[in-house]
Regions:
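ABC ATPase "signature
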Residues: 235-239, 247, 504-508
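Conserved ABC transporter NBD signature motif
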Residues: 66-77, 340-349, 360
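Conserved ABC ATPase "signature" region
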Residues: 129-148, 399-417
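Conserved ABC ATPase signature
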Residues: 152-157, 161, 422-426, 430
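A short, surface-exposed alpha-helical micro-motif characterized by mixed small hydrophobic
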Residues: 220-222, 489-491
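ABC ATPase NBD coupling module
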Residues: 64, 78-95, 113, 121, ...
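A short, proline-enriched helix->beta-strand linker immediately N-terminal to the Walker B motif
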Residues: 172-176, 441-445
């Protein structure tokens, strides 16, 4: 019998906190064979990422402490190897894709410079050959007009495009083992399918092992040969994928398999006047060229979107990465310039200047996809949630603000006693609740939710959806829900707009669009979900 490519043997990892060591991974044993995929599954905080980061000793020590066990690659210990040995393995033989692309991409450098650095360091390639390889790899991961996009900076790409660039960067080294930590979380279903197909193709081509960390069980069904399920730092089940998915033995695994979003949107209040009316919304960014950076053309990213939204109603914006979903949200918030009419509660917003918009701002709030980016790590929860009150209700005393913060924390399911903690001390689901509380404290009429559940595991996702529905019924909130997860959209939204490259492909009542889609692109999205 051939030895495994990667063997994790009885690994235990903890974090030192003052005089104590808190264990986070407890006696984990896993194997990844060449040419096979092991899916590591579990909810937020289960120890998946700590296990993955330990393979290349990427955890800072201290505070991380390796308590017992070993990690072997081709039979050789990585855990106890010299730093020089590990440096030779990192990138060359074992590559890693992280969940948040902005952590891995340098905002100050173009894509070409960052990709070229990988090829020159790890494969010794130079100018023209390296450029051809870069363009080919970007094409393979679905970046349109790859040769032109090489000049772009990370901030000029959509979230999904940044994720694809990061995957391309890891694959350029042609590694023997690829560790992928939630690499498709931010991607729409069509791009997700494309990336999974690419990973399978590269596995066959390179006989590459793949450790795939995810909370998305539909991906596990499509990709994994074996599955290990983690809970509270322990591996509770480890079997071949077909066996585990058809006949799970552990109650936690059974719970995960039954946690897909279900249910219907909340009932609509009758006889409501429109809260938001949007007519022919259009967003175009200038294309500048030459030394003087003169505008030579415009790139239309959102074109001719119209809809009406009532109190207590949810509109879903669906489409692949770069389709204009988030840009539409930014335009409605008046954070970027747009054309067309935006009427909020009878008042036209498109003619108001910044000062005139201020009284309206507290009534339109936003919750972003990644709470790690949207919550200031230097502020505690009390300071984060009360920030809007300081701007919009400056006459409130500190005690009054704190009382409101405690009340809204209870409303979103957070313990008010934790208000003096910092974001890093909370799980992903708890951080998203903090973001919802920050929006809710200003008593808005409309909340724009930009992929608020895509980075959360299924069990936490279900809890956040239940919270959003409860708040919607209680406060008659209107939502604009931006998502690529069609299961979530169907469970929450009353009407839906399907976008592709800034154009409306299909629009209508959610149930009608899902049960009888009229357009081929909508049918394709539904088939892939």
């Amino acid at each position: 019998m051939t030895s495994p490519l990667l063997a994790i043997e009885n690994l235990s990892v903890g974090f030192r906190q003052q005089q104590h060591v808190r264990p986070v991974v407890n006696a984990i044993s896993l194997q990844v064979n060449a040419g096979e995929t092991l899916a590591l599954v579990g909810e937020s905080g289960s120890g998946k990422s700590v296990t993955a980061l330990s393979i290349l000793r990427l955890l800072p020590t201290p505070p991380a402490v390796y308590l017992s066990g070993d990690i072997r690659f081709h039979g050789e210990s990585l855990l106890h190897a010299s730093e020089q040995t590990r440096r030779g393995v990192r990138g060359n033989k074992i590559a890693m894709i992280f969940q948040e692309p902005m952590v891995s991409l340098n905002p100050l450098h173009t894509l070409e410079k960052q990709l070229y650095e990988v090829l020159s360091l790890h494969r010794g390639m130079r100018r023209e050959a390296a450029r051809a390889e870069m363009i080919g790899c970007l094409d393979r991961v679905g970046i349109r007009q790859a040769s032109q996009r090489l000049r772009d900076y990370p901030h000029q790409l959509s979230g999904g495009e940044r994720q694809r660039v990061m995957i391309a960067m890891a694959l350029l080294t042609r590694p023997e083992l690829l560790i992928a930590d939630e690499p498709t979380t931010a991607l729409d279903v069509s791009v997700q399918a494309q990336i999974l197909s690419l990973l399978r193709e590269l596995q066959r081509e390179l006989n590459m092992g793949l450790l795939f960390i995810t909370h998305n069980l539909s991906i596990v069904k499509k990709l994994a040969d074996s599955v290990a399920v983690m809970q509270h730092g322990k591996c509770v089940e480890n079997q071949r994928a077909d066996t585990l998915l058809s006949a799970p033995t552990h109650p936690y695994t059974q719970k995960l398999l039954n946690s897909e979003p279900t249910g219907d949107p909340v009932p609509l209040p009758a006889g409501q006047t429109p809260l938001l009316e949007v007519d022919r919304l259009r967003v175009a960014f200038p294309i500048r060229k030459g030394i003087l950076k003169r505008v030579v053309d415009h790139n239309v990213v959102v074109n001719n979107i119209s809809f009406t939204l009532h109190p207590g109603e949810t509109l879903g914006l669906v489409g692949e990465s770069g389709s204009g979903k988030s840009t539409t949200g930014l335009a409605l918030l008046r954070l970027i310039r747009s054309e067309g009419r935006i009427v909020f509660d009878g008042q036209s917003l498109d003619t108001l200047n910044r000062r005139q918009l201020l009284p309206v701002r507290h009534r339109i709030q936003v919750v972003f996809q990644d709470p790690n980016s949207s919550l200031n790590p230097r502020l505690n929860v009390l300071q984060i949630i009360e920030e809007g009150l300081r701007v919009h209700q400056p006459t409130l005393s500190g005690a009054q603000r704190e009382q409101q913060v405690k009340a809204v924390m209870m409303e979103v399911g957070l313990n008010p006693e934790t208000r003096h903690r910092y974001p890093a001390e909370f799980s992903g689901g708890q951080r998203q609740r903090i973001a919802v509380a920050r929006a809710l404290i200003l008593k808005p009429s409309l909340i724009i939710l930009d992929e608020p559940t895509s980075s959360l595991d299924k069990t936490v996702q279900a809890q956040i959806l239940a919270l959003l529905k409860s708040l919607q019924q209680k406060h008659r909130l209107a939502y604009i829900f931006i998502s690529h997860d069609l299961h979530v959209v169907r469970a929450l939204c009353h009407q839906v707009i399907v976008l592709r490259q800034g154009e409306v492909v299909e629009q209508g009542q959610c149930e009608r669009v899902f049960t009888a889609p009229q357009q081929a692109y909508t049918r394709q999205l539904l088939a892939l979900s």
